């Protein structure tokens, strides 16, 4: 099936979806209605671009006819030639856009995410930088209209983040933040540095798609759940009733502790959400590691320890090492204005996928 047959099939399906969504039987079936609505929304951009492309093709045909019929009218012929030139340029742009729109979609792109940030090499400075990254993602989420909920956090003595787990919910969250997994390096002069020397520290980021129970069911026999008293600063127990939850997935050893909520059930529900995402991600990584060629055709190598970005404070510079992008906008990016970085990563990934399809 060539690209035009594919596009026509997408348009035919889009029109079929419009009819189905008007069917009373479908409207009364909430689950099916939501699934079909999502499918229609996911194909709308492709169909709109395809219809505009067909209009451009018609304009080219009309302009060519006008040139043939314009003998003896230089002004009309010149106007038709200009329209033909513009339409041919638009045709090429639409063809590139449509190729990208037809690329296989990542099934996780529309999902919410579990975001984990940890201070790594560099002690207190790494923890402080982890806090900077947390603020950056929170502010970026605000610009996108997403909901950002800190589910669990651990701070150190200087107010830095040892570890934080957050849920980010909204439209197409994973599609934009999936490229953030990896090691983020910071170069700056710490507040405690009296000699003005630049130190290098690292924080790690992990982005996992939220996994619903219907998508990945964990056998309860594989879980060990411990209930204990939540502890506050200094280690004292802050609740008379045991509400904190420690959940361990026995086959993998993956562990989650949750004590942010006031009730045991809420802590259990949050712990289950995180452990389901981590276990699913664990096995997805094993499968991905067996597909080296495919992994190398996309952004980075898929290695979670890969250094993906450097934030240089003295030079106000951010460098993404995977795509060779350098921006003298560190303050802007850390304030949550990440679009320029994320858009470049998306474009690079799409280009690489197109190249792999053409080879």
UniProtKB/Swiss-Prot annotation:
- Residues modified to N5-methylglutamine: 236
User: Protein name, please?
Assistant: Peptide chain release factor 1
Q: Which PROSITE patterns match?
A: RF_PROK_I
- Record's GO cellular component terms: cytoplasm
What InterPro entries does this protein map onto? PCRF, Pep_chain_release_fac_I, Pep_chain_release_fac_I_sf, Prokaryotic/Mito_RF, RF-1
GO molecular-function terms, A-Z: translation release factor activity, codon specific
Q: Which family does it belong to?
A: Belongs to the prokaryotic/mitochondrial release factor family.
Explain the post-translational modification.
Methylated by PrmC. Methylation increases the termination efficiency of RF1.
Organism from which the protein derives = Streptococcus pyogenes serotype M5 (strain Manfredo)
Cell compartment(s), UniProt: Cytoplasm
Arranged from A to Z, the UniProt key words for this protein are: Cytoplasm, Methylation, Protein biosynthesis
| Main function | Peptide chain release factor 1 directs the termination of translation in response to the peptide chain termination codons UAG and UAA.
| Broad class of the protein's primary localization | cytoplasm
